[in-house]
Amino acid sequence: MRRPGPHNARMHPLDRPVWASLSGPQLRLSHGDDLARRFDPQVNVFASARDDSPQALAALAALVAPGERIFVLQVPPIAVPDGLVAVKLAQGVQMVATRPLGGEAVSEGVRELGDDDAADMLQLAQLTEPGPFLARTHRMGGFVGVRGGDAAGARLLGMAGERMRLPGYTEVSGVCTHPDGRGRGLARGLSAAVADRIQRRGEQPFLHAWKTNVAAIRLYESLGFVCRAEVQVAVLERPAAAG
């Protein structure tokens, strides 16, 4: 796995995937300028500076209100801007698909998820904690899921979808299974279904997992994903104003 230095002038877009997304295909979901951007706070909590220059880091800090938190995810070491504090630092892995995944995709009972499913999606994400997931995160890309029956209001048992998009790549994310749906291979099948959709568009699927989540990494490796790089993750906060 590569670990580019912080001054690598020819950095791959996947090394700063949040920036590549917010300054590219997902610009419409962003706030900021050419130095730093963040997702709309109702969509996601990720943000990124263009680089580690003082100007870009200052612009990133300016996007964060007192008492607010953002997530930064990138391959290079994370520089904490003046005015912000790191309340969490962790490592993950970035994985890319290396083979077609259509044969692994689950199809029975799979349905498209949208605004009408948003409350159930948020509830499932809060229960299983697949990563940052907010009320409008599902608008970042297509999501699919399986419910526990055909009746109206049947429990959402599993879901997966698309998060960051950059030229040539789309991230598989939001993969989670309700405890009542475990043992059915939903995480595997839904991940493959989303990845297959991405591949059919001519793009390469990628994803992120916590470095300590060995079970998830093994699942994705069994689907043909390989580790491209380790990623650094930081939760940054601007302390609330005194008084």
What do these predicted ranges mean?
Residues Q55-L60, G183-Q199, I217-S222:
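Conserved acetyl-CoA-binding loop-helix of GNAT-fold acetyltransferases
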Residues I78-L84, R188, K211-A229:
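Conserved active-site alpha-helix within GNAT-family acetyltransferase domains
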